[in-house]
Amino acid sequence: MENTSLIIENGKSISSEGVRLSIISRELLKEGTTYVLPVSIVGVSDKNLSVIEGSRTIYIVINQVIITQAADLSNRGEYFKVDFRKESKYNTAALTNVTFEARVRFKKMTPTSGKWCFSVMGLEENFCLRTAGSNTEGWKLQLSGGSPAIDSRDVLPNDKWVHLACVYDGSQGKKFIYVNGELQGELPDTRGTVDLTYAYGQDANAAFYIGQSAADDRYMNGYVSEARVWAVARSAADLKNNVCWVDPLTDGLVAYWRFNEPAEDNAKVVTDLTGNGYNATFAGWGNLRFVEGVRCPDNTAE
């Protein structure tokens, strides 16, 4: 920090120079973490003057931009499978609270598309985050399973990064859907628990899908940067504050996939960063592909 002693000349209300703050190294900054630095006026040399307390401290927000890769699932038949039958500290067959999160970019929600559904993640006829709509009315986010389904208030964009989430809160007996951290719908759901090991029409050995649901053409047709499964009911504030990254060891985080690279020992596997062992296996045709230059947060003009 430079210029920490400033002079306000007689008859003026601001100094001719300002305090200069420079970040000389990012080595100790955690990826995806936002930092807030308070800068305060310690005192003034003229004892006849006082500092307005409400203006004594300003807060500088240091928001890092992550530039990474994302899995390219834009072609038909490209998706991931996850086997949640493996034992961990979480009872994945009977979770009383659940949150799914994904940061995705749909690529084929176009006027020529004949599809009604683009899948995000989950379990068909159980707890499945997907879209529902048409090329005339657009596609909304939908949480299906545990009838009735919830549709989002707003239509989803094509070819833009969006953060999508659904929540089951067993204590309230409700389910919720969010787009970019904004609540888009809620309904009662008194099922009691969510089973991550079962889905209708999906692989019994790996029932949880990312980028597909059921057994027909409901593929995502887009990019996926991150996806997470929690054993807690995340709030809107939680969702907004951790779009780009979260500590893999956070309590309640069942599985966390960053789709920026394959596992070292298997080019078709994306590792679960929590250490719980719920790796995502590419089930599509051909090789797993990636797109580069993915920014988060993405504030560029589209």
Spans of model-derived segments:
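Short boundary segments that mark the start of a structured unit
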Residues: 1-68
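Extracytoplasmic low-complexity segments
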Residues: 54-75, 245-302
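Acidic glycine-/aspartate-rich tracts in secreted/extracellular proteins
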Residues: 26-27, 44-46, 106-110, 170-172, ...
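Extracellular glycan-recognition modules
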Residues: 67-140, 234, 238
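Extracellular glycan-interaction surfaces
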Residues: 63-75, 103-109, 130-194, 286-301
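Extracellular/lumenal carbohydrate-interaction signature centered on repeated Trp-anchored short motifs
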Residues: 84-100, 153-162, 217-223, 248-250
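Extracellular, beta-strand-rich glycan-interacting domains
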Residues: 98-108, 218-242, 254-264
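Extracellular glycan-interaction patches encoded by glycine-rich segments
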Residues: 200-225, 237-244, 302
